[in-house]
Curated annotation (Swiss-Prot):
Keywords: Ribonucleoprotein, Ribosomal protein. One of its GO terms (molecular function) is structural constituent of ribosome. One of its GO terms (cellular component) is cytosolic large ribosomal subunit. One of its GO terms (biological process) is cytoplasmic translation. This is Large ribosomal subunit protein eL31. It comes from the Archaea.
């Protein structure tokens, strides 16, 4: 029987509170790294294979480099190429 290539989807609420411990000029950059680390751990995949959508990137950077959100809801879709992370509600 042939196996189907299913893309698995999972919704996560990723806490970004630890980013507040970093200098203000590094916070949004660190928030993106925290998202990659979180998805890598929970989806069991290397960080290099995680793609961050432009909508998710804009949501993190919406208030600039100094004030990223304290949490973000992410829809992670696993495919053969890796994992794509999107903001929940963005299509």
């Amino acid at each position: 029987m042939a196996e189907e290539n299913k893309a698995t989807e999972q919704i996560y609420t990723i806490p970004l509170r630890e980013v507040k411990d970093y200098p203000v000029w590094k916070r949004s950059n660190k928030a993106i790294k925290v998202i990659r680390e979180y998805l890598s751990k929970h989806m069991k995949i290397e960080e290099e294979k995680i793609k961050i959508s432009s909508e998710l990137n804009e949501a993190v950077w919406e208030h600039g480099i100094e004030k990223p959100p304290s949490a973000v809801r992410v829809k992670a879709v696993r495919s053969e190429e890796g994992v794509t992370a999107q903001v929940v509600g963005a299509e």
